[in-house]
């Protein structure tokens, strides 16, 4: 109790996203805010389909909160305890309700707890916006470039927040975990880096589509993978299927997220395969040594890096499933394969 009393009010408040149920509640809040501003500031013709796609995604996450989690269960439990221990006035003599249970020891009394998780959540949830813009246009077989403008603008915000979140997370790991470095290629670190790489690739390739009418199909694929990678990242972080110092598993969220990831992936593939032919007449890149060629090389490197990191992250899971033995992929794998690609990228 003494430790809890000394916790700063900030850390008590930040316990909202320190728990599983609270973090999903925060996800729903961010998604609702993003949806409001998207529909308010992007006056898109026939936006009913955008609303339906948003609603479908929102129902999925709200569904977990409604049917499988109870973010206020602790408050209710403490209230009941308070009533039982009160004499004349309910809650006056409670010994827990004013203190709470406190966050995980790794999360206690650190200022970055107030910044790092929300930054990542805003970055993750924000990837829904370009996905909605691209999917609705593809579904309507709209061959105009309106969607790429919307998708590009709505990618900048989550990309920026992901950048801040990843940077702060690296600093936090260096200070708290004490492994002598800012980045250890931990699975949870990897799954936050993958959508950042894909979003960076899209922000480059979208400019090529606007200027030369190429890479239409590729941009749709990137936008879809950006969104799916955020669901995958949340699955890895919250399910505990992979060994990570950052993973906090609890309840049946892993199964629920895996189900959602499967459904969203199948819908993405189905809609794309049914309608992608309407976007297959884009022009071809002719000058590979010009701006377009370098942007394509940039995309190849970024996507390849994301793919290598994804394979290295999930390989232990498949290995354990097949051979019933746990393994980990060391940093040498990433340093050898990803390191040179990122160095080439810096040269571009």
What do these predicted ranges mean?
Residues 5, 67-80, 89, 175, ...:
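Membrane-helix interface motif
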Residues 19-74, 107, 114, 121-125:
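Mature extracytoplasmic enzyme cores
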Residues 37-59, 139-160, 208-224, 249-256, ...:
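Membrane-interfacial loop-to-helix junctions in multi-pass inner-membrane proteins
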Residues 22-35, 120-134, 191-206, 256-277, ...:
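Hydrophobic cores of alpha-helical transmembrane segments in multi-pass inner/ER membrane proteins
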Residues 43-93, 128-164:
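Carboxylate/His-rich catalytic cores and anion/metal-binding grooves
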Residues 1-4, 8, 12:
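Single conserved hydrophobic/aromatic residue that forms the stacking wall/gate
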Residues 168-190, 240-247:
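Interfacial helix-loop-helix junctions of multi-pass membrane proteins
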Residues 243, 247-348:
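Long hydrophobic segments that form regular secondary structure
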